[in-house]
Amino acid sequence: HINHANWLCLSLLTREGHITSHHISVSIESKPRHTLRPLAVFVRIFTRAMPKYKLSYFPLRGRAEAIRITFAVAGVEFDDILVNPEEWFTKLKHSGLSPSGQLPILEVDGTVLTQSKAILSYLAKEFNLAPKGNLQQAQADSLAHVVNELETTLTEAYGEKDPERKEKGMKTATEEVIPDKCGYFEKILSANKNGFFIGEKLTYADIVVFTFLNSYFMKGKAEGIPEGLKKFPSLSAWYERVRTQPKILEKLKNPTDGFVDYIY
């Protein structure tokens, strides 16, 4: 039997305009023969099993947190595997778990995806969080690549072993690179005028930029607008708009257990 809501959709598929809301259930056996095929297609679509998702990353926000938030926004469950860094570098890195030898990876019914921004782009399309059209999707990808550059800049500076070079690299990142990119984000938001980076609704471009700024300035906390953003009015208003999205706010208030502090 098919429930009331699905039956209304089914009546459109079978072009039976005389069907009313009183027809709340139907047996496949009772349908005319010519309607069985679209009915079968409909049933397959609505009963298709959700893929099994397994995300593997270190116990950090880092490059996986935007993926976690994307799952939260979509309301989709996934296995969040927190990989012990020592075990990764001594055993797992060359075990074949990750084809690229890097994390994060996302397993989708056994198929392994690598590169965090490619994973985000895939999930956005799956969860209706991608912008409309190829041009807007390219704009979203561009913003994701900007964030990837910021992450790389911070990671390289933070991981520098020479103390003087590390201090210089971190100073350049915090005083020059990040403010410059915040100015870039400000210009895009001011030009769009719809409250989000692309179009009129939340997309993965908003998620990836927000996650980086929240992780860098607020260490993943749910509190209000970071001081470092307050000189950018459009960016500040956008940050608060995204932060207070119910599912994002809930995720920020309930971070993954086992996280260790990191630069972002």
Where are these regions (language model features)?
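Short, Lys/Arg-enriched N-terminal segments with co-localized hydrophobic residues
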Residues: 25-49
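GST-like domain detector, emphasizing the conserved glutathione-binding G-site
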Residues: 46-172, 176-182, 191-193, 197, ...
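Surface-exposed helix-capping loop/turn segments at secondary-structure junctions
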Residues: 129, 187-200, 222, 245-252
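GST superfamily/GST-like fold recognition
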Residues: 140, 197-223, 231-236
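Carbohydrate-binding/catalytic loop surfaces
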Residues: 164-167, 256-264
